Amino acid sequence: MNLPQEFEQHTRTLMGDELYQILQKGLEDTPPTSIRLNPLKTSGYNVSVPLADGQVPWCEQGVYLQERPNFTFDPLLHSGAYYVQEAGSMFLDLVMRQYIHRPVTMLDLCAAPGGKSTVARAALPAGSVLFSNEPMHVRANVLAENIQKFGHPDCIVTNNYPRDYRKVGISFDVVLADVPCSGEGMFRKDEGAIGEWSLQNVDKCQTLQLDIIRDIWPCLKPGGLLIYSTCTFNSREDEENVNAIIAELEAEILPVAINDDWNITGSLVDDRPMYRFIPGKTRSEGLFMAVLRKPVEADEANKKQQKAPKKNDTVKGIEHWLQGDFAFVENKGQVRAIPTAWYGLYSLAVKALKVIHAGVTIGTQKGRDIIPDQSLALNIALCQDAFPRVEIDESTALSYLRKEAIMLPSDTPRGFVLLTYQYFPLGFVKNIGNRANNLYPQEWRIKSSHIPEENTHAIYLHDD
């Protein structure tokens, strides 16, 4: 790997010769492949991982793989049964389980593509609400897709800049800021990041990162947690920024209990508790994380919450599709189900933010029908008996995921039918007798026409 000379000089000075040589060798190695199981969907199964190469030690659901299978052609990936994620990013699971033990309102500020958001949602106590935000429109749509595949109803996805949150009137117990960075930790995966690197870019990122934290700081409750992370190695974006947050905003830095044999590196400039993942030393890509607490001042509460709207006739015909207590909101023909416990938060958010997903998208009104949405198919709140189900094999599942026409058994009821693979919901079709209309979202479809002759999947499921 041909690293920029300035990067070598700067990083060697920071790390010292021995640690830098470990990093340099690690960057030449093949990146480890890891997945994280979705406990919302796999907890009732015995899960076998044929390519397993050990557990990710800081995350119970994380598993290393011996090699990288072709994930695209595994229907269980599309069902949300697991997520392909770099192992270091799963460290968030440990942080949250050590510090969050009651229901909270959390914001993942720079959330796309959604890996850390789904880690957070799995670790959050029941009754918590997760806001996942991404400023870039295209990336926000990817984030919304992954949140919907994960399948938890207590999530909102927004497409806003951090400063926009200051006008909402919502205070957060936890803010995760995985801030945009110079990307040194991605050198091994993305050679384009090497070409874009410069010390000038590092300085720009450092300034932007602190601006982001200053923008969102008023939205963090007194006593609330800020989890600051980057995917870079340099101290300017890491230790120096954390120390600036401590000095300027009077934050308290908090330790995370870790094991020595995980080979996580601490701060490279002082003895404050910070956590750095270095390829070659830790089995991961580059990651830096620190946990800070906002000083406790006078209590700040979210504004008075709005009452849920009354149910109209359309809603009364579909509320049996979900288990739980929901408020139903109709907008331009689209029906959303918002858990009533946090409908007030939703009502504040939708007035001031660009909300692109919230709760469960039930479907779209078309004539007398509500065409059920993919969000509904994949959500754990969907009632087992809400729709007729048809179990399909792998070949048919891949055809469905390509949005191709598929054949159903002759005794399949007419109307909307939920297709399942290994009993995991994949999505809806509308059976009209002589054919079934494929309702899989066009933008989610598998675009490759390749059909693998043999593909070892990441996981297999067996009933308990």
Where are the regions a protein language model picked out?
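Polybasic, low-complexity RNA-engagement segments
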Residues: 1-46, 285-288, 295-464
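Helix-to-beta-strand junctions that scaffold the AdoMet/dcAdoMet cofactor pocket
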Residues: 125, 220-222
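S-adenosyl-L-methionine
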Residues: 133-170, 177
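Mobile active-site "lid"/loop adjacent to the S-adenosyl-L-methionine
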Residues: 138, 173-214, 231-238
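Conserved SAM-binding loop of SAM-dependent methyltransferases across substrates and taxa
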Residues: 113-126
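Conserved AdoMet
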Residues: 31-90
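Class I S-adenosyl-L-methionine
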Residues: 172, 225-228, 232-344
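Conserved class I S-adenosyl-L-methionine
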Residues: 102-112
